[in-house]
């Protein structure tokens, strides 16, 4: 790695390069190739997609490095991998493998209930989830180079991702309308670092990209999130838990790109087969709600 690799500017720039694209969860080289051929801008290598993690229960950890290396060897697009919240060693292991991004993810069982990782200590860029501007600003202050809505992973239900995207964007507008001398009180009330809020106010947006994630299951879901202001889309279980993964993958990529072309989205949605089985959020017990992990 060069001396400039790992700087905030470089890491944020790497994340910007994925803007407008779809990032797909994969569990092996075959799925990674399907994702790449469908037009994914990156893949997330893991042992089980969120729907299977949810169904299995128990403790979910970093993927076997063999799987990560297998995926890295199969595709030319960037490869991401997940570590547990606060797990210093899992993050270092993934960095040593040469992954392009690390997702400090609430999909896995948190390793630390007090501290997230100091992502500025790593040369590899990090992705983190958020539900509101407080969470977004705290992750940015820790060094996250890309954000995503938490949604409710593995449910095939878009409602929580919609809620989180609308919440963050509404709060960005609120911050932009505040006087600078009002920001400190807002920072206190939201737990958002003042310096990050100041940057958001001056830019009128988050200083890093914010993708949609957690519940995207159809081309229409992807287009909806783009219309709500997402910079791109993560699809976890929605591709390979569908009836026809290859067709769903291509359709979601196309819908993400052409999210205001309703005739095209209608065409893409015809004859796709069944989407992944969905879960109503109200049926989840509090301990089953992955979005509650992290702080």
Curated annotation (Swiss-Prot):
It is an enzyme of class 4 (lyase). In the presence of PdxT, forms a dodecamer of heterodimers. This is Pyridoxal 5'-phosphate synthase subunit PdxS. D-glyceraldehyde 3-phosphate binds at residue 166. The gene is pdxS. D-ribose 5-phosphate binds at residues 25, 154, 215, 236-237. The active site is at 82 (schiff-base intermediate with d-ribose 5-phosphate). Belongs to the PdxS/SNZ family. It holds the Pfam family SOR_SNZ. It comes from Bacillus cereus (strain G9842). Its EC number is 4.3.3.6. Keywords: Lyase, Pyridoxal phosphate, Schiff base. GO terms for biological process: amino acid metabolic process; pyridoxal phosphate biosynthetic process; pyridoxine biosynthetic process. It comes from the Bacteria.
């Amino acid at each position: 790695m060069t001396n400039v690799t790992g700087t905030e500017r470089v890491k944020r720039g790497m994340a910007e390069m994925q803007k407008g694209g779809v990032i797909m969860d994969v569990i092996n080289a075959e799925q990674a190739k399907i994702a790449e051929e469908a037009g994914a801008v990156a893949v997330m290598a893991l042992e089980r997609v969120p729907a299977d993690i949810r169904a299995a229960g128990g403790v979910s950890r970093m993927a076997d490095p063999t799987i990560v290396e297998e995926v890295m060897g199969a595709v030319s697009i960037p490869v991401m991998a997940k570590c547990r919240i606060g797990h210093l060693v899992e993050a270092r292991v993934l960095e040593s493998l040469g992954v392009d991004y690390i997702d400090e993810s609430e999909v896995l069982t948190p390793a630390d209930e007090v501290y997230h990782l100091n992502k500025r200590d790593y040369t590899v860029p990090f992705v983190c989830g958020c539900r509101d501007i407080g969470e977004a600003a705290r992750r940015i202050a820790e060094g996250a180079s890309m954000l995503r809505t938490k949604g409710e992973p593995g449910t095939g239900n878009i409602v929580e991702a919609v809620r989180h995207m609308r919440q963050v964007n509404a709060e960005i507008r609120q911050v932009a309308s505040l006087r600078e001398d009002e920001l400190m009180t807002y920072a206190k009330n939201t737990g958002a670092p003042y310096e990050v809020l100041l940057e958001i106010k001056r830019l009128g947006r988050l200083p890093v990209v914010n993708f949609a994630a957690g519940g995207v299951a159809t081309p229409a879901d992807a287009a909806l999130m783009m219309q709500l202001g997402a910079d791109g889309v993560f699809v976890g279980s929605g591709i390979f838990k569908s009836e026809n993964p290859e067709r769903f993958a291509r359709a979601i990529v196309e819908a993400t790109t052409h999210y205001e072309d309703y005739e095209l989205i209608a065409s893409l949605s015809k004859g796709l087969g069944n989407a992944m089985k969905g879960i109503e959020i109200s049926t989840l017990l509090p301990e089953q709600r992955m979005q509650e992990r992290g702080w």
